[in-house]
Amino acid sequence: MSTPIKAVLFDFMGTCLDWHSSIVSALPSPIPQHVKSQFALDWRQMYFDANTARIKNSQPTENIDITHQTTLLQMLDKHPDIAPLFTPEVQARAIAAWHHQKAWPEVREAIRKLKEDHGWEVYVHANGTTRLQLNITRSAGLQFDMLFSSELLGSYKPAAENYLRVLELLKLRPEECVTVAAHAYDLRGAKAVDMKTVYVRRVTDDILEDQEVVRRENDAYVEDMRGLDEVIARL
């Protein structure tokens, strides 16, 4: 008999949030829409690369606003044709946009079902700062039992110590917890410490991952969060 689930831990951006629309809308209006879209995707990937480098070099966690500022400047170096449009005010607006995002349409109801219909604890567990997560939960209208940021935990996902610290704080065993994410690297980290995993496919994320490989790696693979509670109940 499988161990009953007690908690569901969500990655945030991409998994629960349509970060792409928020960032695209904050970029200078003269830039063509398709260029803004690709710029946002590349900026996001550069952020991931920066975090990976910090982990590899055993560096401490960094304020996500600083990382976004640094990577934005690197992006502008790669795009000298549009760089003049990014005045200091525009740069500040683009960075602030990461703090104000909308949830994917089905997410709010999915979280409600997990909490009310099943009685599971529901948490955010994601890289970033606590202030970022607080701002986004308000702008997206989402409610969680607790927000666990890399800033709070002192390490980035997918380092094992990040997941183990959350389990320690929650006083739960790995098999009692499910991680839900749109990022394969995150779920690989969760799986490495024996947590159960559900992958959510989002068009804005994991564009370089082989989805067939990702599907095989996880306990469940879903196209969105409709029926997520039923999927988790079967794990």
Where on the chain are the PLM-derived regions?
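Tryptophan-centric aromatic hotspots in well-structured domains and transmembrane helices
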Residues: 19, 101-104, 144
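Extreme N-terminal segments of fungal proteins
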Residues: 1-6, 24, 29-31, 45
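A general structural signal for well-ordered alpha-helical segments in protein cores
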Residues: 23, 40-43, 69, 163, ...
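Generic structural signal for small/hydrophobic residues in well-ordered secondary structure
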Residues: 11-14, 72, 124
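A metal-dependent, Asp-based hydrolase signature
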Residues: 29-33, 37-93
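Asp-based, Mg2+/Mn2+-dependent phosphohydrolase catalytic module
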Residues: 1-8, 112, 123-235
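Short, acidic loop-to-helix structural element flanking the phosphoryl-transfer center
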Residues: 61, 65-66, 83-124, 160
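Asp-based phosphoryl-transfer active-site loop
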Residues: 3-22
